[in-house]
Swiss-Prot record:
Entry's EC annotation: 7.1.2.2
SMART domains (UniProt xref): AAA (SM00382)
Statement: the UniProt record of this protein carries the keyword Signal: no
A GO CC term attached to the entry: plasma membrane
Database matches in SUPFAM superfamilies: C-terminal domain of alpha and beta subunits of F1 ATP synthase (SSF47917), N-terminal domain of alpha and beta subunits of F1 ATP synthase (SSF50615), P-loop containing nucleoside triphosphate hydrolases (SSF52540)
Organism of this sequence: Sorangium cellulosum (strain So ce56)
InterPro entries from the UniProt entry: AAA+_ATPase, ATP-synt_VA_C, ATP_synth_F1_bsu, ATPase_a/bsu_AS, ATPase_alpha/beta_chains, ATPase_F1/V1/A1_a/bsu_N, ATPase_F1/V1/A1_a/bsu_N_sf, ATPase_F1/V1/A1_a/bsu_nucl-bd
Name of the protein this chain belongs to: ATP synthase subunit beta
Membrane-related topology note: Peripheral membrane protein
Signal peptide positions (record): none
Keyword Transferase: no
Top-rank taxon: Bacteria
List of residues binding ATP: 155-162
Subunit structure and binding partners: F-type ATPases have 2 components, CF(1) - the catalytic core - and CF(0) - the membrane proton channel. CF(1) has five subunits: alpha(3), beta(3), gamma(1), delta(1), epsilon(1). CF(0) has three main subunits: a(1), b(2) and c(9-12). The alpha and beta chains form an alternating ring which encloses part of the gamma chain. CF(1) is attached to CF(0) by a central stalk formed by the gamma and epsilon chains, while a peripheral stalk is formed by the delta and b chains.
Amino acid sequence: MVVGKITQVIGPVVDVDFPAGQLPKILNALKLSNPSISAEPDNLVLEVAQHLGESSVRTIAMDSTDGLVRGMEVRDTGKPIMVPVGNECLGRILNVVGVPIDEAGPVHAKKVAPIHREPPPFIEQSTKVEVFETGIKVIDLIAPYRKGGKIGLFGGAGVGKTVLILELINNVAKAHGGVSVFAGVGERTREGNDLFLEMSESKLADGSPVISKAALIYGQMNEPPGARSRVALSALAVAEHFRDEEGQDVLLFVDNIFRFTQAGSEVSALLGRIPSAVGYQPTLSTEMGAFQERITSTTKGSVTSVQAIYVPADDLTDPAPATAFAHLDATTVLSRAISELGIYPAVDPLDSNSTMLDPQIVGEKHYSVARRVQQTLQRYKDLQDIIAILGMDELSEDDKLVVARARKIQKFLSQPFFVAAQFTGLEGKLVPLKDTIAGFEEILDGKLDHVAEQDFYLVGGIEDVKAKASQRAS
């Protein structure tokens, strides 16, 4: 075991001197005891970032450096940061170095995995292009997710990002028997706490809590930048284990990918790198690429990632969101205007898109129904000014029909969620893709022109609409 001594502390950056010829490798984890954090031994982890000459390294701390003094002993673990992986992590909250922070005792994991590793080699990657069915109508129809793909989730505060994430976790557990991993990167601790409590209270079909199928890895706003820039990698290591060792289709949620970049830029400046555009780190695209390339389908299983993306000052050309966009297969945009209409999930069908919506992938029927739905909704949007000024009576008969169908489509895009059952009083619905396509096709073909539009609101498939209509008629 190689032992070094602290020579300098600059905020979250710590310089350590080692005996000549015994320098730890870049990305190795070093451990020491910081009495200011707790009385536990080896409670502070440092990650080697740079070699400074023959005997000194510059490291980034994963926790507070308050209380460190020069001359303190630091030992080299000889390997990268290792986190516990496997079923023992489900239902637990861990921090960036895999220590449980939910006060529920230690994690008795049989295996640990390094947070840094190479993406799967080409020979192991799956070349099959498969749709990842979520059971949520608007997503499956308009912006289908790719198995092993990356999805950007855009939305302001209070439009339903968390509920959508909860429902996806629930549906993955139900439909695919799969697990989810949630990385809380630089967001509010209160939100992380709320998510844990909501997942503990929401129930799966078999009555067990949603949390029993998810692992939560948190590095929130109050953490040093070292922890925030690495916590997404810790979560990815947990997800990769379920994919590679247990052959599962895993959902990885990252909230928020912008904070990952932001933390990287804080660390970069402290390491003395010359900043590039807008003050971001010069290694921005390399760091993002190293993270995103590990999210993929292999011949054993897949990691599908849903990433919430904060857009600073609503500027889509900012280097941080722009770098993330390059990796996305689909975007799901949540709209406040739609949530104000009481339509949940508040996904904007005209703004959301996916590379999977291609007739060669999803088939001619799915593609044409999705495009017809968008055309109808776009026409309705164009007519809204006329309706607001002159009223419905001034429209042609054709346009009146378009408006009536568009309003039914809009209502039918809503759906009762399992995890929101306690708010809506309605049982959640998981709608198979073929039922979704058939339902929208019937509306577009005018087969349901006689049905009142309120019968389309918060239902599952088209059979529910017909049942609701006949119930009202009787």
